[in-house]
C-alpha cells in the first residue's frame, strides 16, 4: 500500500511549516528547494491545505505560509483519510470496477478492510506535533538554522 505523492507532499509541507516559529512564514520556494519537489506541485498542495483550513497563506512580498492551528490539533490519521479519499486496495473494494467472480463469498476483502481500519486507528493517535518533536534533527537534515 502506498500513499499518494500528493499526501506525502502535504505531510512534508505541514512538517516544514510546523517547524517555523509563530512569527516566521514558510514559502513554497524554500520548501521546494529543501525537499527537491516542483513548486507547481507544492502550490496545488498548499491550495488544498488552505481549503482544509490547515494552513493560511499571506500574499505579498513578505507573504508566505503558516499553520492555521496549533500542530497539536492537526491529526495525521484524519488528514490522510481526507487526502486519500479512494483507498481501493483491491478490485473488490470498488463496485464499479469489480469483476472478481469470487467476490460475493470471499473473505479477503474483510481481512484487508480490518487491516485498513487498524492502519488509520494507529495514525489517528498522532498529531503534527508528534512528527516535529525532533525539531533540531529535522532542521539539521533540511539544512536550516533556527532563527
From Swiss-Prot:
Cofactor remark: Binds 1 [2Fe-2S] cluster per subunit.
Keywords: 2Fe-2S, DNA-binding, Iron, Iron-sulfur, Metal-binding, Transcription, Transcription regulation
Family matches, as PROSITE patterns: HTH_RRF2_2 (PS51197)
Segments forming domain HTH rrf2-type: 2-133
Cofactor(s) in the UniProt record: [2Fe-2S] cluster
Gene Ontology terms, MF aspect: 2 iron, 2 sulfur cluster binding; DNA binding; DNA-binding transcription factor activity; metal ion binding
SUPFAM superfamilies attached to this UniProt entry: Winged helix' DNA-binding domain
Name of the molecule in the record: HTH-type transcriptional regulator NsrR
